[in-house]
Amino acid sequence: MEGSKSEAVFDSMNLNPQIFINEAINSVEDYVDQAFDFYARDASKSLKIKGSDKQKSQALSNGIARVRGLLLSVIDNRLKLWESYSLRFCFAVPDGFVLPKSEESSSVHQDGLYDLELDAELDSLRDKLNVVGKRSVELDSELQALERSSVSRERSLRLVNEALELYDESSMDEIFKEMTKMASELRASVERLKTRRMKASESAKVKRLKNHGKEFSAMTFDGKLEDLEKFQAELRKM
């Protein structure tokens, strides 16, 4: 934006977008430093690392420094994109914008008058910058969520493929043979059970017939007609 029309316009209004951007970036870096200072204190407390244990303390510091470096690398890339976007779109002067004449400008500064319309535009510009900043945070959160979801899907797919490899064609043949064998054994068991039941039924009938024969022998001598009819009915049931 250096040497451009936009720079001249902002200079005429005693504004410097680059200073605003630098202050925003410095604020982000300050927040990161404070966050990692708190993280270092809390980690030492949670891990019960005392100041006298220099080896563990140094290992913790090295680990935190590495994580901080990775995080700052990502944040720096994001802030560079945000800075480029802001300078290109948010601080771009619209086509047709005309600077006031020097005499008019000096008279305005001398009289201490302010252009209300320009103040409204500046307020609108600040609001847009806030919206862009919030949207940038939301996009970062969405990107992290997508990355976590992608890792989870890849892991699930890998587990499914490993499970499918266990059930190849040879395994299915073995399972089918085992099921056929079990079905044959079950059929043979059912047939043996039916045979035992038939033998038991026939044995019971023979036993009943013998018992009725004895009763009939006794009836032939002193039995009544009703007893004979009852015996005949029992034989018919058999």
UniProtKB/Swiss-Prot annotation:
Cite the InterPro entries for this sequence: Centromere_Mis12
Give yes or no: UniProt keyword ATP-binding.
no
As for subcellular location, the record says: Chromosome, Centromere, Kinetochore
Q: What is its main location?
A: nucleus
Query: Which GO terms are recorded in the biological process aspect for this UniProt protein?
Result: cell division; meiotic cell cycle; mitotic cell cycle
Keyword Nucleus recorded: no
One GO CC annotation, please?
A: MIS12/MIND type complex
Following inactivation of the gene, the phenotype reported is: Embryonic lethality when homozygous.
Q: Which residues cross the membrane?
A: none
Coiled-coil annotated spans:
117-149
Q: Name one Pfam family in it.
A: Mis12
Its keywords, alphabetically, are: Cell cycle, Cell division, Centromere, Chromosome, Coiled coil, Kinetochore, Meiosis, Mitosis
Quote the function comment for this protein.
Constitutive component of kinetochores that is essential for proper cell division during mitotic cell cycle. May play a role in the modulation of centromere during meiosis.
Q: Which family does it belong to?
A: Belongs to the mis12 family.
Protein name listed in UniProt: Protein MIS12 homolog
**Organism of derivation:** Arabidopsis thaliana (Mouse-ear cress)
